[in-house]
Amino acid sequence: APRSVDWREKGYVTPVKDQGQCGSCWAFSTTGALEGQHFRTKGKLVSLSEQNLVDCSRPEGNQGCNGGLMDQAFQYVQDNGGIDSEESYPYTAKDDEDCRYKAEYNAANDTGFVDIPQGHERALMKAVASVGPVSVAIDAGHSSFQFYQSGIYYEPDCSSEDLDHGVLVVGYGFEGGKKYWIVKNSWGEKWGDKGYIYMAKDRKNHCGIATAASYPLV
């Protein structure tokens, strides 16, 4: 795998979004991975609907604004035969509506998902290099994460098991001798480094970045 990769430069990544006061990070991680794979196969970058996932993937085990898993959302897209565009099914940051999916606005699909071997940063690196942006879950429960602004994030108290936030790895690189993952968050562009965080890479699966990583098959 190359020493550095940044899928933003290749057109795979939509602008940073904002989940608001709703525990729907899992939906944003899911759409991010699907947007990348749709671009890889179709050559078009289309923003996909998180609200579609929030409202409609309860049968797969997701809980709207109270949390969910990216794999269950990938499963929903497969079960449902697609996901609507952001434009046709806009985000409300609420989960009190019934499913409003409409097949005519279907903008992407998947045929399942691949889980990266648990805790293997090298396998994650290979996947990011060959496939594109990958969904990951991390421990984001520290104030150092909430208030991150720049630099390579390393939190001594970070857990590799207690994961509470779904995000998207869009690449990796190094600065001096320090390696990092390029991570797209869903807290708006004002958070972090223009909405992104650069997280320590190859430091014993820091914050669990490779503990629950996956991507959709398209």
Swiss-Prot record:
Record's subcellular location: Lysosome; Apical cell membrane; Cytoplasmic vesicle, Secretory vesicle, Chromaffin granule; Secreted, Extracellular space
Residues that coordinate or bind Zn(2+) 4: E97
Catalytic activity: Specificity close to that of papain. As compared to cathepsin B, cathepsin L exhibits higher activity toward protein substrates, but has little activity on Z-Arg-Arg-NHMec, and no peptidyl-dipeptidase activity
Binding site for Zn(2+) 3: D71, D115
GO cellular component: apical plasma membrane; chromaffin granule; extracellular space; lysosome
Positions that bind Zn(2+) 7: D164
SMART domains: Pept_C1
EC category name: hydrolase
Annotated positions binding Zn(2+) 2: E50, E86
Residue positions binding Zn(2+) 5: D139, H142
Membrane spanning residue stretches: none
Disulfide bonds: C22-C65, C56-C99, C158-C207
Keywords from the UniProt entry: Cell membrane, Cytoplasmic vesicle, Disulfide bond, Hydrolase, Lysosome, Membrane, Metal-binding, Protease, Secreted, Thiol protease, Zinc
Active site (UniProt): C25, H165, N185
Molecular function in Gene Ontology: cysteine-type endopeptidase activity; metal ion binding
Membrane topology reported for the UniProt record: Peripheral membrane protein
EC numbers on record: 3.4.22.15
Annotated positions binding Zn(2+) 1: E9
Keyword 4Fe-4S found: no
Annotated positions binding Zn(2+) 6: D162
PROSITE patterns the UniProt entry points to: THIOL_PROTEASE_ASN, THIOL_PROTEASE_CYS, THIOL_PROTEASE_HIS
Stated family: Belongs to the peptidase C1 family.
Assembly information from the UniProt record: Dimer of a heavy and a light chain linked by disulfide bonds.
UniProt function note: Important for the overall degradation of proteins in lysosomes.
Name assigned to this protein: Procathepsin L
Source species: Gallus gallus (Chicken)
